[in-house]
Amino acid sequence: MPAPSLSFIISPIVGEEADYLLVRSDEYMASLYPAESNHLVSSESLRSGDALFLGAFETAVKGSCSVNTLKGQQQERGQCIGCVAARFYRAQGYAEIKRLYVNEDYRGKAIARSLMAAIEAGVVAEGIQCARLEMGIYQPEAEALYRSLGYRVIPPFGDYLLDPLSQFLEKKLIKNGGGFFVD
């Protein structure tokens, strides 16, 4: 009998349910980069600041992957298996994507792609049409994901300085009726 496929929902993180993922992410980043090249933010700052913090939560529903984002959650949330955040810099006209991470046991199941679609929709819902991010150069899987989603290389932004271990990416999000598309 085949194993049931994964089912998950994406909804806002309101407590500490993603903290264990951020600890794992911090450990992974520390193994790749020196402290001065790590630009990590706490889950508390993402829950309390001008930000949107989303989690992918496993559900008990058996069947294909299902993603319910942001509103109308009817399914009970299980373990948080992935997360992503956006910090809003409204005066500067962009949101910074932070802390995309998926539990190692759940990778390869389109969870990161689903989280990115949800966070981009959340950015557009806030009236912001540009998403930016900083990432390290030793993460080829993450870079491939971002590029496949339409992110392009840009110079350092915000408070970031040029760092040979960092790269900076941007995606223009343009509202198009009920959805959005890439410019």
Give the residues covered by each predicted segment.
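Active-site acidic-Proline motif in GNAT/NAT acetyltransferases
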Residues: N103-K109, I137
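Residue-level marker of alpha-helix boundaries and capping positions
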Residues: I9, K109-A110, L133
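Short coil/turn segments at alpha/beta junctions that flank glycine-rich nucleotide-binding fingerprints
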Residues: K109, E126-Q129
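C-terminal "cap" of GNAT-fold acetyltransferases
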Residues: E16, Q129-R132, G136-D183
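Acetyl-CoA-dependent GNAT
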Residues: A3-K98, N103-D105, M116-A118, G122, ...
